[in-house]
Amino acid sequence: MPKSLNNFLKKINIKPQTKNLANYTTYKIGNISKLFLTPKNIKEAENIFKAAIEEKIKLFILGGGSNILVNDEREIDFPIIYTGYLNKIEIHENKIVGECGADFESLCKIALDNSLSGLEFIYGLPGTLGGAVWMNARCFGNEISEILKKITFIDDKGKTICKEFKKEDFKYKISPFQNKNFFILKIELNLKKDNKKIIEEKMNKNKQARINRGHYLFPSGGSTFKNNKAFLKPSGQIIEECKLKGLSIGGATVSKYHGNFIININNATSKDIKSLIEKVKAEVYLKTGLLLEEEVLYIGFK
């Protein structure tokens, strides 16, 4: 074990667990991590992140496990920080304050119980609040940056900061936290009071749309490719017009319900999924001259 990693583990005083990451991703694909860390509260998370900065340790923050593809051909040799226990949610009038690991279903339920509108667009997704902020989650014409108020995070110097953010600080699927050694801890959302029945109807409508698109039939990472306004069409439509629905490699297939979903239909490997993503990109480029950009993150690949 490298000296820096050994020092890191001594500083955090949390015993790493051995976990199969396939059990923590929506693709149901992954390999063993022997450095799986589960902070039980924000204080423990702060200690982990600050120790990682001090020792220059690469980490991966794992939330709901969507939008990622973990290499299943090799053991993951860097610490995985699982945020599943960082899930506290508080209500303050029309504001929700959630820890980074708060899942969408719990957030939406609490919002509905308190007649608060603004989270309907994420209902039915498997992600967490921290991941949603990191990637500026977007669907049905709404994005998380529209309802953001404050974010508490650790910067690359190990300082805990609470800062207000505006929608203009974010772009399509881009946040100020990407490509930076920052760690999101808590998020404050600014919601609006509305009729409870109307909120519930919107939530159910959005979930039904996901059911109709086959989102829950097979394991997947969610949308595979970002949309690009310059293409004048959603990526899923472009893939469908290239007649790529049903295209398969190994156990991976382009969903027959939605062109932008690559699904694990029959014990797919990470190589199957990655190869199919590359095949779809190549075919679309060959037929249209358009270069699709992945939304999925590759973890543990060289």
Curated annotation (Swiss-Prot):
Protein name: UDP-N-acetylenolpyruvoylglucosamine reductase
Catalytic activity: UDP-N-acetyl-alpha-D-muramate + NADP(+) = UDP-N-acetyl-3-O-(1-carboxyvinyl)-alpha-D-glucosamine + NADPH + H(+)
Cofactor section: FAD
Enzyme class: oxidoreductase
Classification via PANTHER family: UDP-N-ACETYLENOLPYRUVOYLGLUCOSAMINE REDUCTASE
Organism: Borreliella burgdorferi (strain ATCC 35210 / DSM 4680 / CIP 102532 / B31) (Borrelia burgdorferi)
Alphabetized InterPro entries for the sequence: FAD-bd_PCMH (IPR016166), FAD-bd_PCMH-like_sf (IPR036318), FAD-bd_PCMH_sub1 (IPR016167), FAD-bd_PCMH_sub2 (IPR016169), MurB (IPR003170), MurB_C (IPR011601), MurB_C_sf (IPR036635), Oxid_FAD_bind_N (IPR006094)
Principal cellular location given in the protein's record: cytoplasm
Similarity comment: family membership: Belongs to the MurB family.
